Amino acid sequence: VVLKAGLQPCPPIVVGVGIGGTFDHAARMAKQQILRPFGQTNPEPILADMEKRLLMAINSMGFGPMGTGGDTTAMAVHIDYAASHGFMPVAVALNCWINRRTGARLHNDGTVEWFE
């Protein structure tokens, strides 16, 4: 997917992968994984290893930042999974380098509490 997307997602990218469940659930997991904080290791050892190997493979493509060449095509690969039945849907979501993440809590009195 990353090879086919080429420079369209403005590398360096974050790759989110959702495996299993229904396809709409796999797609949602992939999008959620894009927002997982950098450096957060997957608690599942098999998935942590898969993330590491995929990141190395993607970076070996040589696209580099903004397609100028180099070994940083992706900054992170994050994977999640769900139980599945007779078929195994897989969804991949790509996000550009300017990934933004924040959160907020809206209180009854109208105040907003922001946090990362």
State what each model feature region is.
Residues 1-116:
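Non-transmembrane, aqueous-exposed alpha-helical and coiled segments at domain scale
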